[in-house]
């Protein structure tokens, strides 16, 4: 690891400084905080005294030879999120004197992991919490896991004949599947299946809303949205169901306005439109019993409580209040019975419970490469840079003049560009070009050393911070473990899980293990804004520098891919005890290289045998000894059994 000047450490750095730097008091939502040791603490029930030191936990897990990168999943946080959601709706129902109940479902697509779904069903059983499925595979999962006869199984997605028949027959098992009509051609398939099976389903209908949504998923609504029926199609569906004597099975209205809705006004508009559609369906003769408000309940990734894409300008209680109040108002005006309210709030349930931990393998610091020394022979173009550097050094003893500093920095950039042109034309050597780059970095370092942070962000000087920034090499694959950062520029809270009694004197970003330029983490939360560099510590010799990515429990594992053949990480499910000890409930082991290769139809045995044959040729040609061949095969066989990530 790179050495650093200990004199630059701020001995007065406090935990409060770290809290302010990383904003954990805002986005942590009382689940995550910094303790007196300078480590991240996990408090699964927010205001309770039950807490655990995350850094200590990770080290104890590693002592079991379970290596990073790894996902820690805190069951108690998952339980708390389900409880909070149900309590919020219970409070809203009581406040507004609503004459029915809330009955949530979890959309399996958010996190299909068996252990997660089992815990959601266990923790939600008191409220008859159900599941939402969007494919035949998810339908089979839902049917196998849901045992509570009152829990709902909302059947969304494209539906062929088999999907519909399975859902209809599942009613005879005592299940509560509701087939939601999302495409107009599903109506005739349902009618045909009912005739063939002589059994009736519970039906719902998904409406395309005209209300405008916002944010990254704003196109989930409107006439061109992927799913749902237009108003004319809804009218046609009602007509066809009446003709087939199935109108009495139409009991649910569903709508969806996108994921992670940041602005509560968008939700209110959609609720008003959907509530009126619900009323009209009742007037058309359908015995409407449920209204499914879909997903969209957002979480506050940056802690600013604003309508930015990384936040929400409403609380969970605000959301529940608006859902309940709006539906009630529409029903009472039209003398319609209050329906059971369903939500498909996946991200809000599972995001907080998962923390991705990775270690830093090494760093690259531009400042460590600055070794400016006088060279005997220098071209005029290099001398210009030397003069600029000397002028900046002389400013140390002069009154700070921002305009002069800006002028000198612009000169340095111009002279560096001149050197590049000269190198391309063959007028200067590779060594001289290296010297020019070192001089430019030295100029940036001089400016940074005697300007405070407020002036360094002047538009003409802001790139200096980027110039002097560090790259931290992360032992993970962005594409496997946190793909939304690459695919949709999603921002997650990222923070060291220890050393918060020390000032993070570096600014840097992360490069992952893949051979892909997109494999970087370079967008970070900054008090409602997005910054490209994160405050970080210099890694220490022989000590792991551990980083946590928080609120990453939704979608990431399902969407991750095997880019460069990096596989699944270790996943550990944790229960925290009342005495602040913990219990490891489940360990889901990472993929070995052999397992990853077999997913792509490579046989590990055949691979080893192929290499062994090559070693025999090499032995015969005397380019490889028998001992070297044995060592090579042993290394390969051992490697195939081990993780795809780097380890000691």
UniProtKB/Swiss-Prot annotation:
Name this protein carries in UniProt: Biosynthetic arginine decarboxylase
EC number: 4.1.1.19
Top-level lineage group: Bacteria
One GO molecular-function entry: metal ion binding
Family according to the record: Belongs to the Orn/Lys/Arg decarboxylase class-II family. SpeA subfamily.
Enzyme class, first EC level, given as a word: lyase
Keyword annotations: Decarboxylase, Lyase, Magnesium, Metal-binding, Polyamine biosynthesis, Pyridoxal phosphate, Spermidine biosynthesis
Function: Catalyzes the biosynthesis of agmatine from arginine.
PROSITE patterns for the chain: ODR_DC_2_1, ODR_DC_2_2
Modification type N6-(pyridoxal phosphate)lysine: residues: 109
Biological or metabolic pathway of the protein: Amine and polyamine biosynthesis; agmatine biosynthesis; agmatine from L-arginine: step 1/1
Cofactor: Mg(2+); pyridoxal 5'-phosphate
């Amino acid at each position: 690891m790179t050495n650093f000047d200990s004199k630059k450490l701020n001995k007065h750095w406090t935990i409060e400084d770290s809290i302010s730097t990383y904003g954990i008091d805002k986005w942590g939502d009382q689940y995550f905080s910094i303790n007196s040791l300078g480590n991240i603490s996990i408090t699964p029930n927010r205001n309770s005294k039950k807490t655990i030191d995350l850094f200590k936990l990770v080290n104890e897990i590693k002592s079991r030879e379970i290596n990073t990168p790894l996902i820690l999943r805190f069951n108690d946080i998952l339980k708390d999120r389900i409880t909070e959601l149900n309590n919020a709706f219970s409070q809203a129902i009581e406040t507004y004197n609503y004459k029915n109940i809330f009955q949530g479902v979890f959309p399996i697509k958010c996190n299909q992991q068996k252990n997660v779904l089992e815990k959601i069903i266990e923790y939600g059983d008191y409220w008859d919490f159900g599941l939402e499925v969007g494919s035949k595979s998810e339908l089979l999962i839902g049917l196998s896991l849901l045992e509570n006869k009152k829990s709902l199984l909302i059947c969304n997605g494209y539906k062929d004949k088999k999907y519909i028949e399975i859902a209809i027959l599942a009613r005879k098992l005592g299940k509560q599947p509701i087939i939601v009509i999302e495409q107009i051609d599903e109506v005739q398939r349902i009618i045909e299946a009912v005739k063939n099976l002589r059994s009736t389903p519970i039906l719902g209908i998904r409406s395309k809303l005209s209300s405008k949504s916002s944010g990254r998923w704003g196109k989930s609504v409107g006439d061109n949205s992927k799913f749902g029926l237009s108003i004319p199609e809804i009218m046609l569906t009602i007509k066809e169901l009446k003709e087939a004597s199935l109108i009495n099975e139409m009991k649910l209205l569903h709508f969806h306005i996108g994921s992670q809705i940041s602005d509560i006004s968008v939700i209110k508009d959609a609720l008003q439109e959907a509530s009126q559609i619900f009323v009209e369906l009742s007037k058309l003769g359908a015995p409407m019993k449920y209204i499914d408000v879909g997903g969209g309940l957002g979480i506050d990734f940056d802690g600013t409580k604003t309508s930015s894409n990384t936040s929400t300008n409403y609380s969970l209680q605000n959301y529940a209040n608006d859902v309940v109040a709006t539906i009630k108002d529409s029903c009472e005006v039209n003398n319609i019975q209050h329906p059971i309210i369903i939500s498909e709030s996946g991200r809000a349930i599972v995001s907080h419970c998962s923390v991705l931990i990775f270690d830093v393998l090494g760093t690259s610091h531009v400042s460590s490469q600055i070794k400016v020394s006088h060279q005997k022979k220098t071209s005029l173009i290099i001398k210009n840079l030397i003069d600029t550097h000397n002028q900046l050094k002389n400013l140390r003893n002069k009154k700070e003049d921002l305009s002069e500093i800006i002028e000198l920095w612009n000169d340095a950039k111009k002279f560096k560009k001149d050197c590049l042109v000269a190198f391309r034309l063959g007028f200067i050597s590779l060594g001289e070009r290296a010297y020019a780059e070192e001089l430019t970095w030295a100029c940036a370092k001089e400016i940074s050393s005697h300007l405070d942070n407020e002036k360094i962000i002047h538009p003409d000087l802001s790139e200096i911070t980027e110039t002097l920034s560090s790259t931290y090499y992360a032992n993970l694959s962005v594409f496997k473990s946190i793909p939304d950062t690459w695919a949709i520029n999603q921002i997650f809270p990222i923070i060291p899980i220890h050393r918060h009694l020390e000032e993070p004197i570096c600014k840097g970003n992360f490069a992952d293990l893949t051979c892909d330029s997109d494999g970087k983490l370079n967008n970070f939360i900054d008090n409602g804004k997005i910054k490209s560099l994160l405050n970080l510590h210099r890694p220490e010799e022989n000590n792991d520098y551990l980083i946590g990515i928080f609120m990453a429990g939704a979608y990431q594992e399902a969407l991750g891919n095997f880019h460069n053949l990096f596989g699944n990480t270790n996943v550990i499910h944790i229960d925290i005890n009342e005495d602040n000890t913990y219990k490891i409930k489940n360990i889901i082991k990472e993929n070995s290289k052999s397992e990853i290769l077999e997913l792509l139809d490579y046989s590990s045995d055949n691979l080893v045998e192929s290499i062994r044959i090559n070693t025999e040729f090499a032995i015969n040609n005397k380019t490889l000894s028998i001992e070297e061949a044995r060592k090579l095969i042993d290394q390969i066989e051992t490697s195939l059994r081990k993780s795809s990530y780097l380890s000691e």
